[in-house]
């Protein structure tokens, strides 16, 4: 039996760019999620879409007065995944979204969501909130990628945002495949696994825990052209205020298929140590190419 909902109002925050099909797929789930609350708003920051995303979002806002769409032209180019430029850009987008949220009436809870995930368990999110430990400031999703032809093998999604309590900042950028397996193992054992940071496609926040926070890009000392995931410094600030962050096992997100070659699937499933070594080589070559 589901615990009674202790929080009455929610705002769902989304970033959107060229994700029309994902919005069409997840729109009913987002609205169902909001239906568990007495009051809600959905805030979307959209930029530079060319696939009909902008028009779809504005149609959504026309049919639902609780949807707020902030569209703008940014003309940003493709940036290296971990580069300071890309993380700074993502931090700016998330701060713009936070600014839009703060202009609304105060809500109990803020749910940040990657709208391009394949799907998510609505009841899992609600249960994750209603059954959370009293000290929670952020509850992150148990996000998974599925390997093609290996549906029983789950690959942890969004390892870049993950930082365990027994790790320091330096660890967040290295051995991500090994750390992803560690996260998966620990989440399987704990209904709420305490972390310094994670995301997994959905983050649920107490409004009071983030009302004065902002996202930022923090450079790596060893590789100053790269930055930590913008979620990590944001989540560490929540902990500094006396809250606790958790990954909720029940709050499952299906991020879709991990599109890799069959031989890579074999390595990931049966030879993880070899795969980790190849990833290190690949990461080194990738960074060399972006210099």
Enumerate the language-model features and the residues they cover.
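C-terminal catalytic/acceptor-binding lobe
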Residues: 184-291
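N-proximal low-complexity "stem/linker" segments adjacent to membrane-targeting elements
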Residues: 1-32
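Conserved catalytic core of nucleotide-sugar-dependent glycosyltransferases
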Residues: 117-217
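Cell-envelope/extracellular polymer assembly enzymes that use nucleotide-activated donors
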Residues: 9-11, 41, 233
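Acidic helix N-cap motif at the loop->helix transition within catalytic regions
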Residues: 22-24, 51-59
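Short beta-strand-to-loop acidic/aromatic patch adjacent to the donor-nucleotide binding site
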Residues: 105-118
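Active-site-proximal specificity loops/subdomain of glycosyltransferases
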Residues: 60-107
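A conserved acidic beta->alpha catalytic loop
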Residues: 45-55, 74-76
């Amino acid at each position: 039996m589901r615990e009674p909902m202790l929080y009455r109002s929610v705002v769902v925050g989304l970033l959107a760019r060229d994700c029309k099909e994902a919005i069409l797929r997840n729109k009913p789930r987002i609205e169902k999620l909001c239906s568990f609350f007495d009051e809600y708003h959905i805030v979307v920051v959209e930029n530079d879409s060319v696939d009909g995303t902008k028009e779809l979002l504005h149609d959504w806002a026309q049919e639902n007065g609780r949807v707020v769409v902030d569209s703008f032209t940014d003309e940003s180019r493709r940036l290296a995944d971990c580069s300071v430029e890309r993380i700074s850009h993502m931090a700016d987008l998330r701060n713009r979204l936070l600014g839009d949220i703060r202009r609304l009436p105060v809500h109990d809870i803020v749910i940040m969501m990657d709208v391009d995930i394949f799907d998510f368990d609505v009841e899992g999110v609600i249960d994750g909130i209603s059954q959370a430990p009293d000290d929670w400031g952020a509850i992150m999703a148990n996000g998974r990628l599925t390997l093609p032809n290996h549906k029983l093998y789950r690959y942890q999604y969004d390892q870049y945002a993950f930082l365990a309590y027994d790790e320091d900042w330096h660890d967040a950028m290295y051995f991500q495949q090994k750390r992803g397996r560690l996260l998966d193992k620990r989440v399987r054992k704990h209904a709420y696994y305490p972390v310094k940071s994670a995301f997994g496609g959905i983050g649920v926040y107490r409004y009071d825990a983030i009302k004065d926070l902002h996202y930022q890009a923090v450079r790596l000392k060893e590789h100053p052209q790269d930055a930590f995931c913008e979620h990590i410094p944001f989540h560490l600030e929540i902990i500094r205020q006396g809250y606790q962050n958790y990954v909720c096992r029940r709050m499952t997100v299906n991020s879709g298929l991990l599109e890799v070659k069959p031989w890579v699937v074999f390595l990931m499933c049966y030879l993880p140590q070899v795969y980790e070594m190849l990833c290190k080589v690949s990461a080194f070559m990738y960074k060399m190419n972006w210099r």
